[in-house]
Amino acid sequence: VWHRLDPWPDSVAGIGRLREHFIVTPLSNGNIGLLTAMAKRAGLPWDCVLSAEVFRHYKPDPRTYLGVCEVFDIAPAQLMLVAAHVDDLDAAKACGCRTAYVHRPFEFGAGPEQQREKDKARDEARRFDLAVDDLNALASRLASSRSPRWSGVIRG
């Protein structure tokens, strides 16, 4: 099933827009084979594929996020983790990375309990550098900021 996941409707276009200014790669606890198969099937235009397996440490271990910084020879403040999972974003932020929360209403299902959890996460998202509804909105926000602090690599 994981190999056949459909992307979120904004993913392909949003990643394409982000790639105009940033290096975009996933950072997943899934393996590289899985991520490559997902990208090929869904047409995800990542610049490269990174997995926590490369670092032999898995999120939320700080060595995973800092390993990405080593791969690209950048400081943590030049890395932005983009995710719908607040625990992942909290871990990246604790390492000094920039963070962008993407609200995905049905990430964990459509039941009432899942919706309450997602609404709580959205309320908590104010602690991150950016909070957006989709990747196109993220691309627009980053393009409008034109700030050097947003230079670097985008992850999700």
Describe the function of each predicted region.
Residues 1-25, 62:
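Short, acidic loop-to-helix structural element flanking the phosphoryl-transfer center
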Residues 16, 30-156:
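Asp-based, Mg2+/Mn2+-dependent phosphohydrolase catalytic module
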